[in-house]
UniProtKB/Swiss-Prot annotation:
GO molecular function, one term: structural constituent of ribosome
Function description: This protein is located at the 30S-50S ribosomal subunit interface and may play a role in the structure and function of the aminoacyl-tRNA binding site.
Recorded name of the encoding gene: rplS
Biological processes, Gene Ontology terms: translation
Species for this entry: Pseudomonas fluorescens (strain ATCC BAA-477 / NRRL B-23932 / Pf-5)
Keyword S-adenosyl-L-methionine: no
Domain of life from the UniProt record: Bacteria
Highest classification ranks of the organism: Bacteria, Pseudomonadati, Pseudomonadota, Gammaproteobacteria, Pseudomonadales
Family per record: Belongs to the bacterial ribosomal protein bL19 family.
SUPFAM superfamilies: Translation proteins SH3-like domain
GO cellular component: cytosolic large ribosomal subunit
Alphabetical list of InterPro entries matching this protein: Ribosomal_bL19, Ribosomal_bL19_CS, Ribosomal_bL19_sf, Translation_prot_SH3-like_sf
Keywords: Ribonucleoprotein, Ribosomal protein
Cross-referenced Pfam families: Ribosomal_L19
Protein name: Large ribosomal subunit protein bL19
């Protein structure tokens, strides 16, 4: 049972336009990075391995391989640090959480592309 005031505040904070994506999709997240007095955008491209839908507390985890090392980053969906998100490729998977990809490497970690 949530308060109407809390619901109104959460709805106000969830105004950002989010593209539809699911686990298995390859996305590019543009993150605002502050270095000293200047700010720039940093792209983080990888496969969505988990998604958590909780209104304003929604989050998703993206995994990529950087210089042969697996890197995972969890983003808050409605964070002001995220400038934009774009879906590059739709993946055809049958699970909601793709944590098994952590144990796979190379060609075994590929995800089939969704055709339709």
């Amino acid at each position: 049972m949530t308060n109407k005031i809390i619901l109104a505040l959460e709805a106000e904070q969830m105004t950002k336009e989010i593209p539809a994506f699911a686990p298995g999709d390859t996305i590019v997240v543009q993150v605002k990075v502050k270095e000293g007095d200047r700010s720039r955008l940093q792209a983080f491209e990888g496969v969505v391995i988990a998604k958590r839908n909780r209104g304003v507390n929604s989050a998703f985890t993206v995994r990529k391989i950087s210089n042969g090392v697996g890197v995972e980053r969890t983003f808050q969906t409605y964070s002001p640090q995220i400038d934009s998100m774009a879906v590059k490729r739709r993946g055809d998977v049958r699970k909601a959480k793709l944590y098994y990809l952590r144990d796979l490497s190379g060609k075994a970690a590929r995800i089939k592309e969704k055709l339709a």
